[in-house]
Structure formats: structure tokens, C-alpha cells
Design a protein with these regions (language model features):
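Conserved short submotifs of the Hanks-type protein kinase catalytic core
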Residues: 1-11
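Activation segment of protein kinase catalytic domains, centered on the conserved DFG
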Residues: 18-33
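Catalytic-loop of the protein kinase fold
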Residues: 43-60
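Conserved activation segment of eukaryotic-like protein kinases, specifically the C-terminal portion
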Residues: 86-100
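Conserved catalytic-loop aspartate of Hanks-type protein kinases
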Residues: 111
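A conserved short helix/loop substructure at the end of the activation segment
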Residues: 166-178
Length: 278
């Protein structure tokens, strides 16, 4: 049994819900830096979290919108990186790396994929795939390359790092240590912007900001997904094998996966000129 202190400031979900439009990018980046420090510490002792999401990031002592104490919790399914783990898969679909759906083992890079989703959440104020059913079809589309739509509401370098974190190939994702240095650099640049009275603005847009209601079938609690994953991969495999060369070339040209679903990897939701600034 693991006994943890009570964090009266809540978790990252509560922080985003209550402070998205009030916390500056400088404050958000400082908090993000503390989150990646925590993950890096976990990885340094050769542990893989395996269920990393915004509900497992707890806030302690809090200033206005910068949190001095951030703890990564819920290590109940964590394992040593040297321990084989071909067993049941627990988690939340949007935060799970595609290689896990495909039957490969968890690695530190799987946690990094989850961190990329947390970056998206901090950027948009919404949980990934909040408007989708968390079902077999979503698993298949994630394996086809589907990622949440990107908005340009972020400091320079942020989106590029986020996309690297959720790269389909685990080998191409940065380590937690590398992410720390890059987030720190982005944070330093944003501090300079603030000193020059030119901070990155939080833009008011219908595409960002907390939503009052998620899709009722968007399930943001960890659950046993082994059966659903098995069914999804059986269907994904049969669909992939059924396409011919002409269809494959068409899908590649139009940035689509084997199921014929369009990927979102390169789609940008631009902030419109008539949007107001916070």
C-alpha cells in the first residue's frame, strides 16, 4: 500500500479548468517544467509510469497560477523498465501510445507520448479527444496516425516539441531529460518576451478553452482495455490487409491511414484575426 498526502489544490485537470485563461504562458511553462522534472526523476530510477495523464499530476502549494509543488502520483501500475509486462493493459485511450495498442511493451517513450498529450491539454484547455467516443474506432485511428488538432496558441518551439513527443515511432521521441532542457529554453524565451512586454497571448477562440461537457462516451478514468485493444487490432489488421496498391497510394497522397480516415497530424487550427486577446 502506498500512502500519499492530500493535495488540496487538486490535479492538473482542476488547474486548467479554473485557470486556463488567467495563467500566463510563462506560468504554464514553469509548471510544465516541474512536471517533466518529476517524470525524468521516475525514468532516472528506471521506472515506467504506464498510466501518465493529467489526473495523476497533483498540485500542492500554489501561488497565483504557478504551483511550487507538483507530484506525479498513481504509480500502481508502474514497473521497472527491465521488467517484461505482456499482461493486461490499463489506461485512458487518448493518453496511450499507439505501440501499446499494437501489442508492444511499455517503454519510457510510451510515457513521453502521454506527456505530449498533456502538453496539448495545457495548450488548448481541453482533454485530448474530449468530443469523441473512446472506443475501438478511436484506437484504430490513433494507430493510423490520428492526433488532436493543433492550434497556434503556443510559444515558439512548443508545438514542434509536442509533435515529437507523440511521434508514431517511439525511437524518435525525445527523452524526459531532453524535454526538460527544451522546455526550459522555451520558458527562458518567454520570460524575455514578458520582460519586453511582448508575452505570448492566450487567444480567445472557440477552438480552445475548457468545455463544460465532454462526450458522454469519452472515458477519462483508467480501466482494463485489453479486450477492446484486442478487438481493435483484429479489425485494424483486417482493414489494412484489404486495401490494394492503388488505394494505398491514394491514402498516402491524401495523408490517410489504412482505414481511409484522414489524419490530423499536419492540420493547424489557425487563430482567426477577429479573435480577441485575453
Amino acid at each position: 500500500m502506498i500512502i500519499m498526502p492530500y493535495y488540496d489544490s487538486g490535479d492538473l485537470i482542476k488547474y486548467i479548468k479554473n485557470g486556463f485563461y488567467y495563467a500566463s504562458w510563462q506560468e504554464k511553462l514553469k509548471n510544465l517544467k516541474n512536471i517533466i522534472i518529476g517524470l525524468d526523476n521516475i525514468h532516472d530510477v528506471n521506472i515506467i509510469h504506464r498510466d501518465f495523464h493529467s489526473g495523476n499530476i497533483f498540485f500542492g502549494k500554489e501561488g497565483m497560477y504557478f504551483v511550487e509543488e507538483i507530484t506525479i502520483g498513481d504509480l500502481g501500475v508502474s514497473k521497472s523498465a527491465t521488467e517484461s509486462s505482456y499482461n493486461e493493459n490499463y489506461g485512458i485511450i487518448p493518453y496511450m501510445a499507439p505501440e501499446i495498442f499494437q501489442g508492444r511493451e511499455y517503454t519510457k517513450a510510451s510515457d513521453i507520448y502521454s506527456f505530449g498529450m498533456i502538453m496539448w491539454e495545457l495548450m488548448t484547455g481541453r482533454r485530448p479527444f474530449w468530443n469523441r467516443n473512446h472506443d475501438i474506432e478511436l484506437i484504430i485511428e490513433i494507430c493510423d496516425g490520428l492526433r488532436p488538432p493543433i492550434v497556434t496558441n503556443a510559444p515558439n518551439g512548443y508545438i514542434e516539441l509536442m509533435e515529437e513527443c507523440w511521434h508514431f515511432d517511439p525511437e524518435k521521441r525525445p527523452s524526459a531529460t531532453e524535454i526538460f532542457y527544451r522546455v526550459n529554453k522555451i520558458c527562458e524565451e518567454e520570460s524575455k518576451n514578458c520582460d519586453n512586454k511582448n508575452p505570448t497571448e492566450i487567444i480567445k477562440s472557440s477552438d480552445i478553452g475548457p468545455v463544460t461537457t465532454n462526450n458522454p462516451n469519452a472515458i477519462y478514468r483508467s480501466r482494463n482495455l485489453s479486450g477492446m485493444i484486442h478487438s481493435a487490432m483484429s479489425l485494424w489488421s483486417s482493414r489494412s490487409q484489404s486495401i490494394n496498391l492503388e488505394q494505398f497510394n491514394y491514402y498516402q497522397k491524401n495523408n490517410m491511414g489504412p482505414t481511409g480516415k484522414r489524419k490530423y497530424e499536419n492540420d493547424l487550427i489557425e487563430n482567426k484575426e477577429d479573435n480577441g486577446m485575453i
